[in-house]
């Protein structure tokens, strides 16, 4: 396999969208080498995002240009260039990509999925799943301190089930 991968991050997917549908939707832009919806390790349920890998750069860029902000299965999706797993990103912490902290990542602006340092996170702040999202405010998916030690699913600043702080899963 070549060192360069032309991979898109696709966020905001409906829970029902599967790998085959993702591939079918994006294959109109060029040859799709791989398409994968990311599932929760514990529940096996879609986490609402995935990746599509194209054979060439033009196909990837066309897909990003045409599909970012478009609707798929009733949801407005986000499509951008995925950060590579190696090197400069340091495991997705620098400037976007899955779990990235600065300026992007799933859930938008400053904070990745369940990031313990607050500011962004899964569906919070000004991005992700419709503005407020699960963790709402400055909390993220698990409230201020990630899933295990801050607010938990219903904690944080508002959160899915109201309440503030405490809780956890």
Curated annotation (Swiss-Prot):
Q: Which residues form the RRM domain?
A: 6-84
Q: Which residues cross the membrane?
A: none
At the top level, the lineage of the source is Eukaryota
PROSITE patterns attached here? RRM
Enumerate the SMART domains for this protein: RRM
Record carries keyword RNA-binding? yes
**Biological process according to GO:** RNA metabolic process
Q: Which UniProt keywords apply?
A: RNA-binding
Q: Composition bias, kind Gly residues: at what positions?
A: 85-101
A GO molecular function term, named singly, is: RNA binding
Positions of the UniProt region annotated as Disordered: 80-101, 121-169
The record's account of tissue expression is: Expressed only in roots and stems.
Matching entries from InterPro entries are given as: Nucleotide-bd_a/b_plait_sf, RBD_domain_sf, RRM2_NsCP33-like, RRM_dom, SLIRP/GR-RBP-like
Function according to Swiss-Prot or TrEMBL: Possibly has a role in RNA transcription or processing during stress.
Output this protein's name: Glycine-rich RNA-binding protein 10
Question: Which species expresses this protein natively?
Answer: Brassica napus (Rape)
Q: Which gene encodes it?
A: GRP10
